[in-house]
Amino acid sequence: MSLTRDDVLNQAKREIMEISIEELKARLDQGSPLFLLDVRGREEVEQGYIEGAVHVPRGFLELNIEQVVQDRSTPMIVYCAGGVRSALAAKTLQEMGYTDIVSMAGGFNDWRDAGFPVARPEPENHGTERKTAELESEIEQLRRQLEEKERELTSLKKR
């Protein structure tokens, strides 16, 4: 029998712990040591994130998490936009041996809508996206190479 999306999500939610946005806010206000993991996409993160979060997109979680969090007993709270991807990510992290994983119910959207603090600059990124400055530098280098090739072609045509 095939599972539906809801079946998979409900199964994950039965196997993980969840925290409300209010509980997370209280823990952050108390200075509780925890690791915030944002598993949303880059475009979502650019709209804001919870201060202190580290960004590892859900699609790259299994590939990158061991480089980001080596200690599998690190208390970690995972969040996404609405609580679906974070629940699935929490289940995956548990399967990978991480022992203190909690998913934030309601996700970032509920956090923002409650008026809780939202940071704007992008958090540290451990996905596959390249930094803008690197891309701009590469584009400039390619532009110079193209100009050189155009000069060579013009020179050859004049002969």
Task: Give residue spans per PLM region.
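Short, surface-exposed ligand- or partner-binding patches at beta-edge/loop junctions that are enriched
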Residues: 78-80
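Rhodanese-like catalytic fold shared by cysteine-dependent sulfurtransferases
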Residues: 1-35, 42-75, 84-159
